[in-house]
Curated annotation (Swiss-Prot):
Any one GO cellular component localisation term in the record: ribonucleoprotein complex
Function: One of two assembly initiator proteins, it binds directly to the 5'-end of the 23S rRNA, where it nucleates assembly of the 50S subunit. One of the proteins that surrounds the polypeptide exit tunnel on the outside of the subunit.
Name of the featured protein: Large ribosomal subunit protein uL24
Gene: rplX
Entries under InterPro entries matching the protein: KOW, Rib_uL2_dom2, Ribosomal_uL24, Ribosomal_uL24_CS, Ribosomal_uL24_KOW, Translation_prot_SH3-like_sf
Keyword Ribosomal protein: yes
Keyword annotations: Ribonucleoprotein, Ribosomal protein, RNA-binding, rRNA-binding
Family membership: Belongs to the universal ribosomal protein uL24 family.
Top-level taxon of origin: Bacteria
GO MF term list: rRNA binding; structural constituent of ribosome
Stored SMART domains: KOW
CDD domains: KOW_RPL26 (cd06089)
Subunit note: Part of the 50S ribosomal subunit.
Amino acid sequence: MAKIKKDDLVQVISGKDKGKQGKVLRVFPTDERVLVEGVNRVTKHLRAGQDNNGSTEGGLQVVEAPIHISNVAVVDPETKKPTRVGYRFETVEKDGVSKTVKVRFAKASGKEL
């Protein structure tokens, strides 16, 4: 189970883009990969052809490629450094009814994510 979710701010902790931070655009849980904004950019060669909007030009296009989930860590909102993610159960009272909710938190600072 991936502890990284869409729209999380993550930092690359290993690989060619080590140290870069970006927002998670998409999570691929079956492949254990995440697509991070501005990280792991690759050049894609496009052939001239047609699509739904008409003809398209060929050429080179730079796009982000998915990166393995073990190579990124969630950034702590308080310290702005990579941290591990934990879960805890908190009791929330709403309209006189108490309810137990599972929340994610940064292990370094204890702040809720």
